[in-house]
Curated annotation (Swiss-Prot):
This is Co-chaperone protein DjlA. It comes from Shewanella oneidensis (strain ATCC 700550 / JCM 31522 / CIP 106686 / LMG 19005 / NCIMB 14063 / MR-1). NCBIfam families: PRK09430.1 (NF006948). The keyword NADP does not apply. SMART domains: DnaJ. Regulatory DnaK co-chaperone. Direct interaction between DnaK and DjlA is needed for the induction of the wcaABCDE operon, involved in the synthesis of a colanic acid polysaccharide capsule, possibly through activation of the RcsB/RcsC phosphotransfer signaling pathway. The colanic acid capsule may help the bacterium survive conditions outside the host. It is a single-pass type III membrane protein. Its main location: membrane. One of its GO terms (molecular function) is protein-folding chaperone binding. Residues 1-6 are periplasmic.
Length: 262
């Protein structure tokens, strides 16, 4: 039984990235250990992971640019959302320039949305959490001005379909993100806040306590930062995943408080 890949992957990952790095190293080491005799080397596996992260990074900002231009022109709000995302990711220097360039490319009339999404889907096969987070980022861009026009919805529908999502799934994500946005805007004592807390968790006030817990665990599992990075999320985007997990936790705490749940 091979285990040296997992061992060295864990140790090296922990040295450079503590808990998150150890998880990523353990996963890469696992891939190395289970390869057949003539399979890919550790450096090739690492290269594949980096390539996946690079495609996720560039496609995210390129499609954001395309979504932002959907209404005919890129507004100050669109630019602010892209800048805020870069700030959340703490992008500086070459990484920030790369993101800005990808955003500009997405705004171009000849940007091939479907080809970009097909390449993205090819490297995220079996990593549904990554795909969902990607779609959620595009939804955030489309709703940056608080409204969703027909052109923006059409592009989001194309994004969803190319990545294996149906209209109902997209509408559910739209509903959850809108609830999350409002949840940030309202005070903890506001009735709208508890309604949006339920919507953010993807349930209604009629849900049982058990259903509330199940919905919370499912969402936290889907948005766990370390799991997302291990599946190919660029480390720079970990802060976005952290914030999403915090929002889910806040909504769950709000619902628990309202119900008197332990």
């Amino acid at each position: 039984m091979r285990f040296w890949g997992k061992f060295f992957g864990f140790v090296i990952g922990f040295m450079f990235g503590r808990f998150f790095g150890a998880l990523l190293g353990l996963w890469l080491g696992h891939l190395y250990d289970k390869r057949p005799g003539g399979g890919a080397s550790f450096s090739q596996i690492l290269g594949q992971a980096k390539n996946r992260q690079g495609i996720f990074f560039n496609t995210t900002f390129a499609v954001m640019g395309h979504v932002a231009k959907a209404s005919g022109r890129v507004t100050e709000t669109d630019i602010r959302i892209a800048t805020l995302l870069m700030d959340q990711m703490r992008l500086t220097g070459d990484a920030r320039k790369e993101a800005q360039q990808a955003f500009r490319e997405g705004k171009e009339p000849d940007f091939d949305l479907c080809s970009s999404l097909q390449a993205f889907r090819a490297v995220t096969q079996g990593r549904q959490e990554l795909v969902q987070m990607f779609i959620e980022i595009q939804i955030q861009t489309a709703l940056s001005d608080g409204e969703l026009d027909a052109a923006e919805h059409a592009i989001l529908m194309t994004v969803a379909q190319e990545l294996g999502y149906g209209r109902q799934q997209l509408d559910e994500l739209l509903k959850r993100w809108q609830a999350e946005f409002r949840f940030h805007q309202t005070s903890s004592g506001n009735k709208t806040s508890i309604t949006d807390a339920y919507h953010l968790l993807g349930i209604t006030a009629e849900a049982t306590d058990q259903e509330v817990k199940r919905a919370y665990r499912k969402l936290m599992n889907e948005h766990h930062p370390d799991k997302l990075v291990a599946k190919g999320l660029p480390p720079e985007m970990m802060e976005i995943a952290n914030r999403k997990a915090q929002d889910i936790q806040a909504a769950y705490d709000r619902v628990k408080s309202e119900r008197g749940m332990r």
